[in-house]
Amino acid sequence: MAENLANHLLDEMIEALSSLPGIGRKSAFRISFHLLRLEQGLFNQFIHQLTDTKNKIKFCKRCGSYAETEICEICVSEKRDSHTFCVVEQPEDIFFIENTREFQGKYHVLNGVISPLEGIGPRDLRIKELLERIEPEQVKEVLIATNPTLEGDATADYLANQLKPISVNVTRIAYGITVGGSIELADQYTLGRAIRSRLQL
């Protein structure tokens, strides 16, 4: 009975871990046994950190990125170029761009891309919120950093058309990111070069 219970619990743990992006069943298997071998104090600390992070991290009310407060550190920073916005698909894209140290402006998260096949249209994204920020924050350039996919391209084109009537320079992240690739998988050099080589839309 105990043996079956242990196997059942392990299977559930492995299944839960393998549902995470980038973790296959073999990796989930190794992680599960590593966690079981952890000293109880370290294990409790690990679980506490996960729970604490999940409970305290929220979305910035201004840009939509992850934040510990209502407005994130980048949005309130006076050291950032508040006249330049970088528009990304997801909050995690900001972390990869920040690692390049090439972009010194502020961000806006769309929370996805236009995808008719999945029933996602412009109204399902944070496009309205972006347009509402342009004039009050005196934005002069919007760098569109959507992924070079069909959906990312369609979203970039839509944004460019929406921003045309406004007196703002619209650019897009360029060379270095392969078509069909993603910002998350690009190395710092490639992503940095893409930011430096952004194109006028």
Swiss-Prot record:
Any single biological process term in GO: double-strand break repair
Classification via PROSITE patterns: RECR (PS01300), TOPRIM (PS50880)
Coiled-coil segments: none
Zn finger spans (C4-type): 60-75
One Pfam family hit: Toprim_4
Toprim domain boundaries: 83-178
Protein keywords: DNA damage, DNA recombination, DNA repair, Metal-binding, Zinc, Zinc-finger
Function of the molecule: May play a role in DNA repair. It seems to be involved in an RecBC-independent recombinational process of DNA repair. It may act with RecF and RecO.
Protein name: Recombination protein RecR
Organism of origin: Leptospira interrogans serogroup Icterohaemorrhagiae serovar Lai (strain 56601)
Gene name of the record: recR
